[in-house]
């Protein structure tokens, strides 16, 4: 009998020993802090992007509109130089790491440098031309274009609720634009081009980060580096460089401070965008930008100085804002449900494996 008893309790060869319930509980408790940290990092990345995006719009608006700085290209050039300088110093001091240049780097980054340049310049130009409420409401189109880009490049699908809220945002933008007394055709064209480029840039950044070839610092560095000389050439041949040199505000300390801040914020925003996209998604990054724009819309109405109030325009702005809030809520809840479903499937798979 003793022998039979020993055989019953002896582990079978090739079979893993069963885990005790206490051990399983310890594993589950050990996973909780890691999951909490991941959520915290996602929220931190999203918040960092929102604050950075808010500050750069306000500072750029002040430099280009309030001080009437004549060259959006030169502001963009300053942002590129600041990005390259900060990352080069960081790499030299071994604070950040990214691959050295080789002949494969252009292939690994393409088409991001072109999208980065176009996104930056059209964004600056439209900031100069449009009042802040209309600038922010027309930025809603970037969500629509991001959906198209993620569908085409990342094969993502979107629910009926998401599509309806995006439709509401676009309708609100059209209503607001129909009664925009400060209408500027160039500003409208540039902001819509900027929306397309923002969407394409976000989707491609996610694609490049997933490939893990250059990393976020490498993408930031080489995007800016490759476009410095082309931007300088364009600024020279269009006369923008000459206008910038002849600008009378260089003696103004407050202007110099804001111009420098604009250049540095260009790098910080690029970093925040890549960070938010890495920890979340291109669509989440766009949502955060959208929520930030709500704040800018109302601040621009009161303090912008170039907003002309009409009821139709005001109602259109608020329709778009309401749509963006509902959209953000639906997207967030869908993401949480998706994660819960994935976690449930993993547990089911483990349970079947244990049996």
UniProtKB/Swiss-Prot annotation:
Could you confirm whether the keyword Cytoplasm appears in this record? no
Task: List the catalysed reactions.
Answer: UDP-N-acetyl-alpha-D-glucosamine(in) + UDP-alpha-D-glucuronate(out) = UDP-N-acetyl-alpha-D-glucosamine(out) + UDP-alpha-D-glucuronate(in); UDP-N-acetyl-alpha-D-galactosamine(in) + UDP-alpha-D-glucuronate(out) = UDP-N-acetyl-alpha-D-galactosamine(out) + UDP-alpha-D-glucuronate(in); UMP(out) + UDP-N-acetyl-alpha-D-glucosamine(in) = UMP(in) + UDP-N-acetyl-alpha-D-glucosamine(out); UDP-N-acetyl-alpha-D-galactosamine(in) + UMP(out) = UDP-N-acetyl-alpha-D-galactosamine(out) + UMP(in)
Q: Where in the cell is it found?
A: Endoplasmic reticulum membrane
Q: How would you describe this protein's topology in the membrane?
A: Multi-pass membrane protein
User: Quick one: where's region Disordered?
Assistant: 1-27
Question: InterPro entries per the record?
Answer: Sugar_P_trans_dom (IPR004853), TPT_transporter (IPR050186)
Disruption phenotype annotation: Neonatal lethality. Skeletal development is severely impaired leading to reduced snout and body length, and extremely short limbs. The proliferating zone of epiphyseal cartilage is disorganized with densely packed round chondrocytes and little extracellular matrix, in contrast to the regular columnar organization of chondrocytes in wild type cartilage. Chondroitin sulfate content of cartilage is significantly reduced, associated with reduced proteoglycan aggregates in the extracellular matrix.
One of its Pfam families is TPT
Q: Which GO terms describe its molecular function?
A: antiporter activity; pyrimidine nucleotide-sugar transmembrane transporter activity; UDP-glucuronate transmembrane transporter activity
Q: Which UniProt keywords apply?
A: Endoplasmic reticulum, Membrane, Sugar transport, Transmembrane, Transmembrane helix, Transport
Q: Which residues cross the membrane?
A: 39-59, 69-89, 157-177, 185-205, 217-237, 254-274, 281-303, 315-335
Family, according to the entry, reads as follows: Belongs to the TPT transporter family. SLC35D subfamily.
Function, please? Antiporter that transports nucleotide sugars across the endoplasmic reticulum (ER) membrane in exchange for either their cognate nucleoside monophosphate or another nucleotide sugar. Transports various UDP-sugars including UDP-N-acetyl-alpha-D-glucosamine (UDP-GlcNAc), UDP-N-acetyl-alpha-D-galactosamine (UDP-GalNAc) and UDP-alpha-D-glucuronate (UDP-GlcA), which are used by ER glucosyltransferases as sugar donors for the synthesis of sugar chains of glycoproteins, glycolipids and oligosaccharides.
Record protein name field = Nucleotide sugar transporter SLC35D1
């Amino acid at each position: 009998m003793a022998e039979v008893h020993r055989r019953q309790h002896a582990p079978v060869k090739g079979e893993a020993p069963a885990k005790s319930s206490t051990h399983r509980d310890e594993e589950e408790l050990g996973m909780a802090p890691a999951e909490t940290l991941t959520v915290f990092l996602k929220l931190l990345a999203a918040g960092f992007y929102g604050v950075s995006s808010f500050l750069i719009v306000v500072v750029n608006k002040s430099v280009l509109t309030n001080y009437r700085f004549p060259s959006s290209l030169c502001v963009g050039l300053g942002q590129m130089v600041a990005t390259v300088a900060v990352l080069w110093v960081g790499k030299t001091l071994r604070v950040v790491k990214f691959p050295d240049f080789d002949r494969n780097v252009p292939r690994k980054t393409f088409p991001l440098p072109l999208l980065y340049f176009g996104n930056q310049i059209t964004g600056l130009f439209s900031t100069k031309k449009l009042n802040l409420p209309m600038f922010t409401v027309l930025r809603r189109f970037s969500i629509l274009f991001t959906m198209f880009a993620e569908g085409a490049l990342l094969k993502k699908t979107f629910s009926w609720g998401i599509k309806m809220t995006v439709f509401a945002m676009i309708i609100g933008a059209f209503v607001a634009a129909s009664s925009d007394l400060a209408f500027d055709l160039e500003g409208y064209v540039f902001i819509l081009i900027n929306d397309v480029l923002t969407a394409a840039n976000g989707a491609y950044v996610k694609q490049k980060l997933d490939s893990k070839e250059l990393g976020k610092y490498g993408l930031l560095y080489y995007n800016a580096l490759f476009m410095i000389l082309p931007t300088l050439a364009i600024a020279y041949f269009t006369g923008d460089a000459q206008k910038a040199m002849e600008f009378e505000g260089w003696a103004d300390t407050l202007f110099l401070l804001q111009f420098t801040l604009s250049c540095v914020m260009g790098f910080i925003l690029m970093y925040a965008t890549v960070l938010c996209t890495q920890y979340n998604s291109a669509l989440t990054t766009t949502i955060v930008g959208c929520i930030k724009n709500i704040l800018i819309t109302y601040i621009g109405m009161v303090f912008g100085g170039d907003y002309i109030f009409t009821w139709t325009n005001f109602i259109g702005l608020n329709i778009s804002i309401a749509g963006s809030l509902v959209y953000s809520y639906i997207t967030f809840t869908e993401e949480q449900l998706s994660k819960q479903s994935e976690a449930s499937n993993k547990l089911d798979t483990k349970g079947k494996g244990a049996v």
